[in-house]
Each structure stands twice: as C-alpha cells, then as structure tokens.
Curated annotation (Swiss-Prot):
Its EC number is 1.5.1.5, 3.5.4.9. Pathway: One-carbon metabolism; tetrahydrofolate interconversion. Homodimer. GO terms for molecular function: methenyltetrahydrofolate cyclohydrolase activity; methylenetetrahydrofolate dehydrogenase (NADP+) activity. It comes from Oceanobacillus iheyensis (strain DSM 14371 / CIP 107618 / JCM 11309 / KCTC 3954 / HTE831). Catalyzes the oxidation of 5,10-methylenetetrahydrofolate to 5,10-methenyltetrahydrofolate and then the hydrolysis of 5,10-methenyltetrahydrofolate to 10-formyltetrahydrofolate. NADP(+) binds at residues 164-166, 189, 230. One of its GO terms (cellular component) is cytosol. Keywords: Amino-acid biosynthesis, Histidine biosynthesis, Hydrolase, Methionine biosynthesis, Multifunctional enzyme, NADP, One-carbon metabolism, Oxidoreductase, Purine biosynthesis. Pfam families: THF_DHG_CYH, THF_DHG_CYH_C. This is Bifunctional protein FolD.
Length: 285
C-alpha cells in the first residue's frame, strides 16, 4: 500500500513558514503584492482565483483581482498588463488561463514583465530554467519537485516517465528532473507502446487531463506516482488521471486528487510572489 504524498498538509506547513517571512518583510516596509487578472466568467477559473486570493490572505501577501469582460479586446488587456508592469507596488502579475478565443495567449504571456512573471511562463524565464539559472519556476512543476524533496525521494539516476508534454507541466517538470540527474522520458498522445514505457518508470508523472486513464497495469512495482490531473465526475466530485484505488496497491508513494498537487501549485505561486518582491526591491533572497 502506497504512502500518500499529501499536498494539502505540506502546503499548510509551507504557508506558515511564508507568513513568518512576509511578516519580516513587512517590518522592513515591503509587502509582497500579487495582481490576478481574470477575463470572462469561466467557473473553474473563478474557483482557482478564489483559492489564490484565500492563500494570499493566509500568508499576509497583499492581492487584488482585476475582473474583465469576456469580450474585452486584446489591446485593452495589454494596456492593463502594461499598467501593472509599471506599478512599483505590484510584484507579481498572473493572467488566469485559459483566455477567450480572441486573445493570443502567447502574446499576453510575453507582455508580462519577466521580473513579475510569477507563473514562470515568460520565454525569458523558461530559457533561464532550461539552463539552470535562478528564475521563476512554473508553479505546478515546482510544487511536484517540492513534494518529492519533502519525502527525501532520491531522483538521481532514477527513470522518470512523464505522460503529457504541455508547456505548463509536462515539459518543465522533465527539465527540472533532468537537473536533478534523473533520466527522463516524455510520452504523449502519439507514443507507441505507452504501457511498456511507463512500466519502466521509477517516477511516473501523469498530466493528460483524462479521468482514470492510467491504472496499476501501467505502473512498476514501488514506483512513485504523481497525478496532476483534475477532472470532474458526473456527481461533481474531483478525480485524477490515475485510477487511485488500483495504483495505490502498487506504488510506493502516490498523490491523491484532491489534496495532492493542486494545493502545492497555489503555494508555489505565493513563493514566487515573495521571490519577485525581494528581487524587485533588492532584498537578499
């Protein structure tokens, strides 16, 4: 039976440590501030944004939400981002994805100042991450790595298999694991013999957005299984990309859904916001 990697518990511990750090910064006259921009009325996006606001409040990070109509023009959104870039009281800027169809997502991401890009999506920060330089790491991969480290799970020489190749999770977590001296294999929708490959994984990371796509048949005995998927069942409950009940019989460690990777993603956003505030104000990190 697998040991749970409980992201909810770990995130609460980390937030308490961050609160102490934020209080110390406030004593120096610096309050980290995050601006979240939400375009449209996507219920899932609204829920995520609420979670971010709540987490900011717990740690003492200041935050504000700019809510914009679905039909706002791209130029208007770019103007708002520019204003936030030039506001010295704002340290982190997050544009909640996905954006409406009339928006060029890449152009919007590129418009955020790299120094305030707390999502870690700007190409300058992605490039720095790739070369191992100090930068903002995308929040979900950062959360996964933090969870693995919290249990002293050795990555060196281990075979990590990633199912999914998105810019938000799949690609960056592979780079981070490579920097930890893991051997990394990417798999995706065009991969042949997927099961054959995943059964070689010491660490299996699943990020495909399809409920229960992976079960115990895909998992090597005693593998570490990280389930990034968040899917809503017919009864409204959340479930992951991994069939938890079968997988936990085979894995050594496994993340649940919910209370796994999700809470860690928000917590790493807070960590990046504190980092941004320090960097913009020349405070020692």
């Amino acid at each position: 039976m697998a040991t749970l990697l409980n992201g909810k518990e770990l995130s609460e511990e980390l937030k308490q440590k961050m609160k102490i750090e934020v209080d110390e910064l406030k004593e120096k006259g610096l309050t980290p501030h995050l601006t979240v921009i939400l375009v449209g009325d996507n219920p899932a996006s609204k829920s995520y944004v609420k979670g971010k606001e709540k987490a900011c409040a717990v740690t003492g990070i200041s935050s504000n939400l700019i809510e914009l109509p679905e039909n706002i023009s791209q130029d208007e959104l770019l103007q708002i981002i520019d204003e936030q870039n030039n506001d010295d009281s704002v340290h982190g800027i997050l544009v909640q994805l996905p954006l409406p169809d009339q928006m060029d997502e890449q152009k919007i991401i590129h418009a955020i100042s790299p120094a305030k890009d707390v999502d870690g999506f700007h190409p300058i920060n992605v490039g720095k991450m790739m070369t191992g330089e100090d930068t903002f790491i995308p929040c979900t991969p950062y959360g996964i790595l933090t969870m693995l480290r919290s249990k002293d799970i050795s990555l060196e020489g281990k075979h990590a298999v990633i199912i999914g190749r998105s810019n938000i999770v799949g690609k960056p977590i592979g780079l981070l694991l490579l920097q930890e001296n893991a051997t990394v294999t990417y798999t995706h929708s065009r991969t042949k013999n997927l099961q054959e490959i995943t059964k070689q994984a010491d660490i299996l990371i699943v990020a495909i957005g399809r409920a229960h796509a992976i079960n115990a048949d895909y998992i090597k005995e005693d593998a570490v299984v990280i389930d990034v998927g968040i899917n809503r069942k017919d009864d409204g409950k959340l479930t992951g990309d991994v069939d938890f009940e079968s997988a936990e019989q085979k894995a050594s460690y496994i993340t649940p859904v919910p209370r796994g990777v999700g809470p860690m993603t928000i917590t790493m956003l807070l960590k990046n916001t504190i980092k941004a505030a320090k960097g913009l104000n020349d405070v020692e990190r």
